[in-house]
């Protein structure tokens, strides 16, 4: 099966290239955000707007019951919204520390995801948000293995998607 990992994050691209020899990696172009390792801007958005993605894996700076998933940078929010919109299946990946007051800009709500994966749900905040919003998202609580957590160090709010290449 041909798998292509699409990301705007240099750390994710490097990790995937080094550790997933059967996967192709598409690093989205764009403006490199100062002091971060990911691309944003109109070039990134233009490329994303042309892609059809099977699965999107999105992270967040914070989650708040009232405000949803938020991030600190507007350009990052735009990329996340596009990835979510272009994917058939959408996953939020977050740890419990992200349940906190909102960051600067909202990019999604629980209704935008098929699955939300976390290490645990503090005080049932995520489950309550899913129920209160009539969302269809599955909530999965999974403690990551220590080696998996340490394997890739990225800005904790980055995203990537997977698409299949069609031969011929």
PLM feature spans:
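Conserved phosphate- and dinucleotide-binding cores of soluble alpha/beta proteins
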Residues: 6, 10-168
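Glycine-rich beta-alpha loop segments
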Residues: 1
């Amino acid at each position: 099966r041909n798998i292509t990992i699409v990301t705007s994050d240099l750390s994710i691209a490097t990790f995937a290239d080094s550790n997933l020899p059967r996967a192709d990696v598409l690093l989205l172009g764009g403006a490199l955000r100062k002091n971060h390792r990911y691309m944003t801007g109109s070039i990134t958005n233009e490329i994303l707007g042309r892609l059809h993605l099977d699965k999107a894996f999105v992270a967040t700076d914070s989650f708040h019951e009232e405000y949803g998933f938020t991030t600190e940078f507007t350009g990052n929010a735009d990329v996340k919204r596009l990835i979510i919109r272009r994917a058939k299946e959408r996953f939020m990946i977050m740890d419990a520390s992200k349940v906190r007051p909102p960051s600067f800009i909202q990019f999604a709500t629980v209704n935008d995801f098929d699955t939300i994966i976390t290490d645990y749900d503090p005080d049932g905040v995520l489950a309550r948000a899913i129920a209160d919003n009539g969302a269809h998202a599955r909530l999965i609580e999974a403690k990551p293995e220590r080696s998996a957590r340490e394997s890739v160090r990225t800005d904790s709010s980055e995203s990537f998607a997977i698409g299949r290449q069609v031969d011929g």
